[in-house]
């Protein structure tokens, strides 16, 4: 088989039709899966010796949340090291990263696999992976044809990453530095709430404004602070963390501002506080609502004038610190109750951010579950950790009062339990491995009982005829793709279609 000009043009057109990078990536992957008639395709971004899925087709949704470290995935490492098309034989001893992650084929190993490394100049920026259940599925495509596909994908990904770099550095194209992947804290989620939060982080990161991050316990407020710092001009300097809730009143002032030798009993030497440590960088004050009113007043002075006094010292020190604060309280209510200073609240909340709870993030729970499954796989040295359909359904309908932190602990516990019930290094998480209280799953919809007007043979043929019609429509009348969807041999499908009057 060879690609026609029309096929390549169609791929290029789909890339241009997309609205935004994510849509273009998804169109590319979906089109490639149809053109190459494969069971699964994925576009991956390369960053810090790991591949990060950007778009998938034919794979379980939790794949989008997984982070594939090269050390744990020899096939992906081989793709990263190669400068050209990589074909893995059906009998390859290297495990496929997608084994168990193709819906409907969880118990089968992937047979055919092709990897296409993507480059921008000499820099590896990503990869395309193509997988099929038939051992010779990609033999009909030459390396040259696959290189054309890789070139189109590399161009799309390179442009997207360059635009991302320009936006993050607030540069005009004429000032662009040589292509370099932008380091980012990975905030996993594609829900509207998380998409909006990521946009707001991009906006505020480039400024020097103080930020108040609010959200329930376990939603990931510290991750938001890290993302702001890493995308800011202060990223080359430290991000210093202080949990205000864990500060004893007796040492709180010293922790924040430092002390000099002899300032109090036990002060045997000079000590820098968190503000000094964060000079020219960022200070993250977690659980800011737990600070006493006395400390709030001293913190306000630092924000107003930019100077601090160590405990026991009469001299002032100038510091240049950006403050990011987080709380799980409603600070407006705390102000009204007299437990939080109104002037400090207004100083901190120049640019407020709200982190949505997990129960409002829809399918993000599955992406996050995939991320934690992959973490457990690496930590425990397992070959694979996958979610069953029942486990995914359970996760999507649980309320998660503890948010992302509760999900993380639940996945880790489930992996340990599942591992104990079966031998080998493969773990499949079932619903019974999760100990969630009072989870009410939606009942299956009751199907209406049809009035029988046909004999069994006629009813069976009518059902087969309609099923094939729907499969053909979904696969653009591609008989090979239709056969794979229906899990039957393509020759048998042709014979059945002729008998049913669907083919001449």
From Swiss-Prot:
GO biological process, one term: phosphorelay signal transduction system
Sigma-54 factor interaction domain ranges (all copies): 187-416
Pathway: Nitrogen metabolism; nitric oxide reduction
Listed SMART domains: AAA, GAF
InterPro entries assigned to the protein according to its UniProt record, in alphabetical order: AAA+_ATPase, GAF, GAF-like_dom_sf, Homeodomain-like_sf, NorR, P-loop_NTPase, Sigma_54_int, Sigma_54_int_dom_ATP-bd_1
A matching Pfam family: Sigma54_activat
DNA-binding region(s) in UniProt: 479-498
Binding-site residues for ATP, renumbered to this chain: 215-222, 278-287
Membrane keyword on record: no
Residue positions where 4-aspartylphosphate is found in the record: 57
GO molecular function, one term: ATP hydrolysis activity
Domain of life: Bacteria
Disulfide bond positions: none
Record keywords: ATP-binding, DNA-binding, Nucleotide-binding, Phosphoprotein, Transcription, Transcription regulation
Function of the molecule: Required for the expression of anaerobic nitric oxide (NO) reductase, acts as a transcriptional activator for at least the norVW operon. Activation also requires sigma-54.
Protein name: Anaerobic nitric oxide reductase transcription regulator NorR
Protein source organism: Escherichia coli O6:K15:H31 (strain 536 / UPEC)
């Amino acid at each position: 088989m060879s690609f026609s000009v029309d096929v390549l043009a169609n791929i290029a057109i789909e890339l241009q039709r997309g609205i935004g990078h994510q849509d273009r990536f998804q169109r590319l992957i979906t089109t490639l899966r149809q053109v190459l008639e494969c069971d699964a395709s994925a576009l991956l971004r390369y960053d810090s010796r790991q591949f990060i899925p950007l778009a998938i087709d034919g794979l379980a949704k939790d794949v989008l949340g997984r982070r594939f470290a090269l050390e744990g995935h020899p096939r992906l490492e081989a793709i990263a090291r190669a400068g050209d098309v990589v074909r893995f034989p059906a009998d390859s001893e290297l495990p496929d990263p997608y084994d168990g992650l193709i819906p409907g084929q969880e118990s089968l190993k992937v047979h055919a696999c092709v990897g296409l490394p993507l480059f921008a100049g000499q820099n590896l920026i990503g990869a395309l992976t193509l997988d099929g259940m038939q051992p010779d599925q990609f033999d009909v495509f030459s390396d040259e044809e696959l290189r054309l596909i890789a070139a189109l994908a590399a161009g799309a990904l390179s442009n997207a990453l360059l635009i991302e770099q320009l936006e993050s550095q607030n540069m005009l194209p004429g000032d662009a530095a040589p292509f370099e992947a932008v380091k980012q804290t990975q905030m996993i989620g594609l829900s509207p709430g998380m998409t909006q939060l990521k946009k707001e982080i991009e906006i505020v990161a480039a400024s020097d404004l103080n930020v108040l991050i609010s959200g329930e316990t376990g939603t990931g407020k510290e991750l938001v602070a890290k993302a702001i710092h890493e995308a800011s001009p202060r990223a080359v300097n430290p991000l210093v963390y202080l949990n205000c809730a864990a500060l004893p009143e007796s040492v709180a002032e010293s922790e924040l501002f430092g002390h000099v030798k002899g300032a109090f009993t036990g002060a045997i030497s000079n000590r820098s506080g968190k503000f000094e440590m964060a000079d020219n960088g960022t200070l993250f004050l977690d659980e800011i609502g737990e600070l006493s009113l006395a400390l709030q007043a001293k913190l306000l002075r630092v924000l107003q004038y930019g100077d601090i006094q160590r405990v026991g010292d009469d001299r002032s020190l100038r510091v240049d610190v950006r403050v990011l604060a987080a709380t799980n309280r409603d600070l407006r209510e705390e102000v009204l109750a007299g437990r939080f200073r109104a002037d400090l609240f207004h100083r901190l909340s120049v640019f407020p951010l709200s982190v949505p709870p997990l129960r409002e993030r829809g399918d993000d729970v599955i992406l996050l579950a995939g991320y934690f499954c992959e973490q457990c796989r690496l930590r425990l040295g397992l070959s694979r950790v996958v979610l069953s359909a029942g486990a995914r359904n359970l996760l999507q309908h649980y309320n998660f009062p503890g948010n992302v932190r509760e999900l993380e602990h639940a996945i880790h516990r489930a992996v340990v339990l599942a591992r104990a019930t079966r031998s080998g290094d493969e773990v499949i998480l079932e619903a019974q491995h999760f100990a969630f209280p009072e989870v009410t799953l939606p009942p299956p919809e009751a199907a209406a009982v049809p009035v029988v007007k046909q004999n069994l043979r006629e009813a069976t043929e009518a059902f087969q005829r309609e099923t094939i019609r729907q499969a053909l429509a979904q696969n653009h009348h591609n008989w090979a793709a239709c056969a794979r969807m229906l899990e039957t041999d393509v020759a048998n499908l042709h014979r059945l279609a002729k008998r049913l009057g669907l083919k001449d």
